[in-house]
Every structure is written in C-alpha cells, then in structure tokens.
Amino acid sequence: MKVIKTLSIINFFIFVTFNIKNESKYSNTFINNAYNMSIRRSMAESKPSTGAGGSAGGSAGGSAGGSAGGSAGGSAGSGDGNGADAEGSSSTPATTTTTKTTTTTTTTNDAEASTSTSSENPNHKNAETNPKGKGEVQEPNQANKETQNNSNVQQDSQTKSNVPPTQDADTKSPTAQPEQAENSAPTAEQTESPELQSAPENKGTGQHGHMHGSRNNHPQNTSDSQKECTDGNKENCGAATSLLNNSSNIASINKFVVLISATLVLSFAIFI
C-alpha cells in the first residue's frame, strides 16, 4: 500500500508539472497567433495607402508640369511676336527686346536707304536739266558727286565700326600661346590622376562582390512559412507554424488523458 501511495504522489506531481508546461505552450501559441494577425493587418493597410500616395504624386506632377509648360509656351510666343514686330519696322529704333544683330541690320538698311536716295537724285536732276529728252549724255552735277562721296564715307565708317575688336587679341595671342602650352602640362597630369584613383575603387568593388559571394555561399535555414511569405502568399504566412502547434497540442492532450486515467486508477486503488 505504501508503494501505491508513493506512486500516486509522484504521478500527481508529474501531472502538475505537465499542466504548467502545457499552459506555457498555449500562451506562446496565443502570442504568436496575435503577432501574425497584427502583421497581416499592417500589410493590408499599407497597400491602399501606397496607391493613394502614387495617385496624389502623379496628379500633382501632371498639373504642375502642364501649368509650367503652358506658361512657358505662352511667354515664348509673345516674345517671338515682339521680336518680329521690331525687325519688321526698320525705321523705328532698336528696343530692349531686340538683340545687337537687329541693331546692325537697321543701320545697314538706313545706309542702303541713303545710298538709294543719293543714286536716285542724279536721275531727277538730269531729267530737270534735259526737259526735251535729247540723246546727249550729261555728266552728273557737283552736288550729286558730293552726296555720293558722303555715302561712300559713311559706308567706310560703318565697315570700320563693324570690325570686331578681337583682332588686337589675336595679334597678342602668339605671346599667350607658350603660357597655354605650359598650362596644358598640368592638365595632362590631371587626366592621368583619375586613372590612378580608379584603381583602389576597383579593388573595393571586388572585395565587396567577394563579400556578397561569401555571404550567399552560406546555407540558409528557412522554414516553410518563411518561404511562403517570400513567395508572395501573404495569407499563408504563419499557417505552417500554427499547424505544427496544433499537432503538438494534440500530442499534449493525449498525454493529459493518459495521466488523468492513471491518477484515477491509482486513486481508486488507494481508497478501495
């Protein structure tokens, strides 16, 4: 009888210890399930938020680009119209919108107009001197000669003014050429220096690639649940772990049944 009592007491303590372990297992599974559910909810909430951000960014970018393009096009068109009006009226002076080239063209047009008037004047004066239209050829008057000389002088002054002032710089350029040749030497050294600098960068990239290769060569212990999560089946994340937990729970329940039956048998044996 003493042996049966001692066995029943030992069985009772074993039963209590198994109950404590199983309660800890149930609590762990509950925490894991709650964590998996929170992850799924966060993933589901992140999808519509990213779509709204993309649509807002696209609409803002499109509206900004359209308004900027329209305003730029309109301003450019108005600028071209002003330039065309300024070029069409040769008699008006050059405004701020026209460039230096337009001013030179207006001066040449004025010179041509002056020369055309001077060339037309002798015909009128010759017509006045020859009212009857005789076949004799008359020489131009002194006034016509003076106007032609004045027009030639104006053309010479314009050609002198149109000469660019860069000729003096060109004449002085041979003295500056040896300085440029001296400056070309450090530029050649500078072109060689990036090649020297690129060598350690290549070494660094090689080491970086080697490190990645060594990391990829290590075996990775991934469970079925992690593979499913990486494949894109977000709904199945944690499904395999929950199934394993359920199987372990079933085994523990069987153990409980066996222990309860053993305690009942021992208790009947003790009291009987």
Curated annotation (Swiss-Prot):
Biased composition (Basic and acidic residues): 122-137
Keyword Glycoprotein: yes
Compositional bias ranges of the Polar residues kind: 139-165, 172-200
Signal peptide from the UniProt entry: 1-20
Biotech use, per record: Potential candidate for the development of parasite blood stage vaccines. In vivo, induces antibodies capable of inhibiting parasite growth in the host. In vitro, antibodies to MSP2 do not appear to inhibit invasion directly but may function to opsonize merozoites and promote antibody-dependent cellular inhibition mediated by host monocytes.
Known glycosylation sites: N22, N36, N149, N221, N245, N246
Topology of the protein relative to the lipid bilayer: Lipid-anchor; GPI-anchor
One GO CC annotation: plasma membrane
Residues with lipid group (GPI-anchor amidated asparagine): N246
Role, per record: May play a role in the merozoite attachment to the erythrocyte.
Protein name, entry field: Merozoite surface protein 2
Source species: Plasmodium falciparum (isolate 3D7)
Encoding gene, per UniProt annotation: MSP2
